[in-house]
Amino acid sequence: MHLLFTVLVTFFASMGAGLGTGFAGMSAAAVISPMLITFLHMDPYMAVGIALSSDVLASAVSAYTYHKNKNLDIKNGLIMMASVLTFTVVGSWVASKVPSATMGGFSVFMTFLLGIKFILRPVMTTKEAMQGVSAQKRAVQLVVCGVLIGFICGFIGAGGGMMMLLILTSVLGYELKTAVGTSVFIMTFTALTGAVSHFMIGGTPDWLVWGLCVVFTLLWARIAAVFANKAAPKTLNRATGVVLVVLGVVIMGFNLLT
């Protein structure tokens, strides 16, 4: 009975996480962690470690799918990733020096609002319009935004994927598919860094839960990424919006339960 319960919890947690990753480049940690903590009474630090390692393969497979469909900006993604990773470390160092405030709720609420934005005001930028920005200007924008995202993520410990998507589409004028593709590409490496450091500090995870989460998240992320790359922009905006709104509401519900 306990095994069946574990399988069900990990399946639904990973389904939400995989769909969020494949459609919107959202971090699996936002969905998987609260469910593992609430239902399986797992240590929060370990739950985040498991969620981040589920994120690594799911993001990598999504990034590969977006890349195959020419919806990934690798060169600029690498520039942004360097500044995000550097300042995540700075942010978490600063956070360790100030009294801890739980800011996780902020990133969940942002997920919900971002979902509503995609439904009401779809991102209809084209790839042609994206190419209109000079390479130097784009590089500077990416470094500045990367510093901001990295610092906030390190400080709060959450919200990376959503902030990247918001900034890539709203500030940097990326077309939606390319924004998600670039976001999951960066998330692959940020999640890997996070997962390794969690397990080095917190010890080995519950291997059954870890394995189930990794496999299920990978499966759902692949399904979502394939659909997202075939969908028309308007349909994709709506689908992404609905996934984000539902996940935002569900996670807020779990946060109230705990």
List the predicted regions and their residue ranges.
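Transmembrane helix-bundle signature of multi-pass membrane transporters/permeases
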Residues: 18, 48-56, 180-191, 244
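Transmembrane helix boundary and interhelical junction motifs in multipass membrane proteins
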Residues: 23-32, 157-167
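A small-residue-rich subset of transmembrane alpha-helices
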Residues: 54, 182-198, 208-221
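Short, structured loop/turn "capping" segments at alpha-beta junctions
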Residues: 126-127, 158-163, 174-178
